[in-house]
């Protein structure tokens, strides 16, 4: 089909308007004929298009139409500036704010705690961080994270009470209270091979304890009974230089772990000490993207970890892996003569979080972001 102009050339129009002559009636007639020819061509084009659609197979037309509708729907949901309205982490914990309870149990009041701090507009902030990451890098592989942030309130509200991460839930991850050693075999073997190294550095640190004061670098955590101390090398993704200098070999060891979380707020590495008679009440961790690893350093009788209702005991020189987004608690019911229960705790990536997702989560949950 040959394209036809919808009107006479511009010069003819100008001549017709501004240069009256005896040929004006003839030019007007030519102009009308040209328009008539153009409309005939347009009508023929439309008729041809309609006939082409009629000649197509009805099933094929319906299929193409459905695919087009699905594509438009997908673009709408992916391209929205803001996620659907949902309950923020802050509002999930608002009811507990007045009396210091979390899921019916005491929680810490530390302003630095990513799990217990009430962060206004957290979900919107996470979505903004994800969009910023995608602009810099790619949306490829971000489906689960995008889904998790968009539907966070629904996920957290609909989770069974046995597993309810307080900050971020990544959907479609296999769930189990305890993991086998093979889940992160390399890192487990590295830690267990260096058991004596870590134990020696702990014993040097522990000599500074006295009945009258808490040694520098140690933190005392809130418990209903007993005493729970922690000595952080990495605290919520941030290295603690003063403490690392006191445990140089243990700190260097962290660098040899392949799956250690060290660049986002869900990553920690510390020595955890429970004195006899201590009870850590049931609580949930902040996320399901990590595995918490405990390497037993000193494990007297009467000590127990309960995750998702399943009890386990620590063993010296052995790693115990669990998902702390499950409801969990710890006890030291031994006597004063038994001494403290001591573990080296480090957070590892859940084995089913892909490499691209790990990079994005490090960006989204970077300390201070």
Swiss-Prot record:
UniProt-listed SUPFAM superfamilies: Clavaminate synthase-like (SSF51197)
Keyword Ion transport among record annotations: no
Keyword set for this entry?
A: Dioxygenase, Glycoprotein, Iron, Membrane, Metal-binding, Oxidoreductase, Signal-anchor, Transmembrane, Transmembrane helix
Give the UniProt entry's GO cellular component terms. membrane
**Keyword Transmembrane helix attributed:** yes
A Pfam family: Asp_Arg_Hydrox
Role according to the record: May function as 2-oxoglutarate-dependent dioxygenase.
Membrane-crossing residue ranges in chain numbering: 59-79
Instruction: Name where it's found.
Output: Membrane
* Family recorded in the similarity comment: Belongs to the aspartyl/asparaginyl beta-hydroxylase family.
The name this protein carries in UniProt is Aspartate beta-hydroxylase domain-containing protein 2
Indicate which residues the UniProt annotation says bind Fe cation. 283, 328
EC annotation from Swiss-Prot or TrEMBL? 1.14.11.-
InterPro entries listed in its UniProt record: Asp/Arg/Pro-Hydrxlase, Asp/Asn_beta-hydroxylase, IPNS-like_sf
Give residues annotated as binding 2-oxoglutarate. Answer: 228, 272, 292-294, 341
